Amino acid sequence: MINRKKNFLSLYVHWPYCESKCPYCDFNSHVIEDVDKDAWTKSYTNQLYEYKSFLDRFDVKYDNLSTIFFGGGTPSLMPLKILDHILDISSKIFKFKDDIEISLEANPSSYEREKFRQMHKLGINRISIGVQSLNDKNLQFLGRKHNYRDAETAIDLATNTFNNVSIDLIYALYEQNIDDWENELQSVLNKFNINHLSAYQLTIERGTRFFKDFKKGLLKAIDNDLAAEFFTRTKTILNEHNFQRYEISNFAKEKFESKHNLNYWNSENWIGIGPGAYGRMWSSNQDNKRVEIKNYKNPKTWLNKNSQNSEFENINIFNQYESDIDTLIMGLRLSKGIEIEKLIDKSIIQKKKFKELEEENLIIIENGKIKINDDHLIKLNSILSYLIN
């Protein structure tokens, strides 16, 4: 049995609302004109107190809160009063580490740009801007509400307000060629003083408008060879600008990796409040197995269940094998891989599936670690699916 020391503790806050639904998005996001601010504030508060009781109940070993991440949806649309209240209550319940990272996702619309300075005053110290593209034609294809000028202004304002700025970009779009993508990426890196960049290949997810178009033959996915070339060139260009890949789609300058996401991938403790959010933690009184707590996904259902008291949809205690698979699936996303010492049953890597992957040179097991071979990173999802199933 692993004698776990105190793990980090992170908080994820989900705000499910957006101005519009993007055609590629399969996240738990919805369009609504107005919300009951008091009910939402009360529900978030109830969940924070309920999580504290669960951490005590499962004897979860953790230090003070190390990160908070406001995601969505579009959390920069969250009323500032709710944002301020969540930060205030969570600091009282869990206490903040001195170097706590507090991140918030934002879109480059004019309304949200005006809130950057106010958010910074409330305690947000890291901003992640959903730029997605600096090409107006691509932005229109992606169903985004902003244009290139909006994005440029938002990034400039963010870098003048926050010391830690990340942007998201989507590449390998339908009919996009590699030269255009390289020029766009080079432009971003040469023009803006950002510390972190998330670069995602466009995927056609079930339940999205793009998926419907794909089924109708109106949209095509790029072939695997071209996708691999996009991926390789992206890594090369970012490395040339001193951005190191630390996770499959995430690149950062030294010391600017997302602490919050690293807590996920390193299988630390985290709690999640809001519709569809979930938490995972190590329980000392459950033989150090992983405990998962899930919230109701539908915003109306979640609000009804939490505005008076707090109610989670499901609490699941992983068995030993599930705990180890969860640790592996999260950790194998990291460029450094995962330490075998973190596994409850270290003999799991002797099982047939792992031996097959190692023989095919898809994974590397050495120096007490397991990692995906860099030459096969593009196959990560297939490798993880194989391990899960």
Predicted regions and their residues:
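C-terminal scaffold of the Radical SAM
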Residues: 6-8, 29-54, 64-346
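Minor-groove-contacting beta-hairpin "wing" of winged helix-turn-helix DNA-binding domains
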Residues: 369-373
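N-terminal [4Fe-4S]-dependent radical SAM core
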Residues: 1-11, 58-62
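Short amphipathic alpha-helical interaction segments
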Residues: 344-359
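A short, conserved structural fragment
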Residues: 358-368
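Short, amphipathic alpha-helical interaction segments positioned at domain boundaries
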Residues: 375-389
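Local cysteine-cluster metal-coordination motifs and their immediate loop/turn environment
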Residues: 16-29
